[in-house]
Amino acid sequence: MEYASDQLLPRDMQILFPTIYCRLNAINYCQYLKTFLVQRAQPAACDHTLVLESKVDTVRQVLRKIVSTDAVFSEARARP
């Protein structure tokens, strides 16, 4: 099944991240890395940092639920 995001990705990215779950995981990791780099450059934590951290945490929770739900359905399909 081809998703709309497939057309936006360069071919090498499609090869590196063949499934939608690989792509979601890569996005999650990139968000984490970007947040880490930005926060490391700041001398002190501020309200903006807390808001950003909460948003990133929310995205992580959503991604975990998607992958968890898929795992449950995959197990159910595998049972005879």
Curated annotation (Swiss-Prot):
It comes from Human herpesvirus 8 type P (isolate GK18) (HHV-8). It comes from the Viruses. This is Tripartite terminase subunit 2. Component of the molecular motor that translocates viral genomic DNA in empty capsid during DNA packaging. Forms a tripartite terminase complex together with TRM1 and TRM3 in the host cytoplasm. Once the complex reaches the host nucleus, it interacts with the capsid portal vertex. This portal forms a ring in which genomic DNA is translocated into the capsid. Belongs to the herpesviridae TRM2 protein family. Its main location: host cell. Keywords: Host nucleus, Viral genome packaging, Viral release from host cell. It holds the Pfam family Herpes_UL33. Associates with TRM1 and TRM3 to form the tripartite terminase complex. It is found in: Host nucleus. Coiled coil: none annotated. GO terms for biological process: viral DNA genome packaging. GO terms for cellular component: host cell nucleus. The keyword Protein biosynthesis does not apply.
